[in-house]
């Protein structure tokens, strides 16, 4: 049985800003820009109480929270703090799989400290993060990656939650599927239409049913409904692409609706690019039709895509020619590949595509 920890920094970007500027502490803070095209990169817990969250348009966030304070992002600082945190992880285990600047999986079944309890390691790490960075982290401890991820959400912020092998299956059965890692809003809505609202409902469906309705994701849903996840923690995972996709609630037939659906996907991918200091030269558009067949269209440029506006322009070049669409569009996705890193000197604004 493996011992897995999922560490998730609490409102990471916003917490760094509040740490470095005492005047922001205790106030609703959004990292991003307040302009009409701006997007919230991160929100403090004070802002989240008003319904503000990451990837929300700035104008919407300001409407929800008139007292919201916007601060420009400092991704060079966030990356530096992330490196501090990664250094702490490395003192306990070589099996660290970073998911982003602010979260990671650790396999501590065998660890450098010779500690038998993963909970003890998680508490040590949380304490060191607090002492060395003056930030808080939440941790989930369990026997696989899925449950460790679910556990870290249970006591946020600044908490620890453990899911043991004895309690794992019951925990999953009681959990709403919309809270499952890997189940997005569109998938949760589809599950609801199929009468699946809890882990118990999901477990009651056989593998053939889940494969019929969810394709390649079917086996994943089948096993996590039973508290089983065999994925290993993969250290130094080399990312070959950055992508985002979404399923429409109703099939899309017109270009304007497709454009509107593509905008948040472009923003999500660009947000990751800015946060990680990565850029890509090849952009791929994925279109899944109503009959589940799909096509992809790609464009490669000489220099890495340098802005969200440029990314939007390329997306338009790929999207427009498929209209008038021969059939309804079920899903759109956008991916950047041919990746490379950039230095910290140029950080364009996180913004919504025009």
Curated annotation (Swiss-Prot):
EC number of this enzyme: 2.7.7.7
Reaction catalysed by this enzyme: DNA(n) + a 2'-deoxyribonucleoside 5'-triphosphate = DNA(n+1) + diphosphate
Active-site annotation: 103
Major localisation: cytoplasm
Gene Ontology CC: cytosol
Gene it is expressed from: dinB2
SUPFAM superfamilies, alphabetized: DNA/RNA polymerases, Lesion bypass DNA polymerase (Y-family), little finger domain
Annotated cofactor note: Binds 2 magnesium ions per subunit.
PANTHER family reported for this sequence: DNA POLYMERASE KAPPA, DNA REPAIR POLYMERASE UMUC / TRANSFERASE FAMILY MEMBER
Protein name per its UniProtKB record: DNA polymerase IV 2
Keyword presence, Metal-binding: yes
Entry's family note: Belongs to the DNA polymerase type-Y family.
Function: Poorly processive, error-prone DNA polymerase involved in untargeted mutagenesis. Copies undamaged DNA at stalled replication forks, which arise in vivo from mismatched or misaligned primer ends. These misaligned primers can be extended by PolIV. Exhibits no 3'-5' exonuclease (proofreading) activity. May be involved in translesional synthesis, in conjunction with the beta clamp from PolIII.
DNA damage among keywords: yes
Cross-referenced Gene3D superfamilies: 3.30.70.270, 3.40.1170.60, 5' to 3' exonuclease, C-terminal subdomain, DNA polymerase, Y-family, little finger domain
PROSITE patterns on file: UMUC
Superkingdom field: Bacteria
GO biological process, one term: SOS response
Cofactor: Mg(2+)
Assembly and oligomerization: Monomer.
Keywords assigned: Cytoplasm, DNA damage, DNA repair, DNA replication, DNA-binding, DNA-directed DNA polymerase, Magnesium, Metal-binding, Mutator protein, Nucleotidyltransferase, Plasmid, Transferase
Organism lineage string: Bacteria, Pseudomonadati, Pseudomonadota, Alphaproteobacteria, Hyphomicrobiales
Database matches in NCBIfam families: PRK02406.1 (NF002677)
UmuC domain residues: 4-184
Compartmental location: Cytoplasm
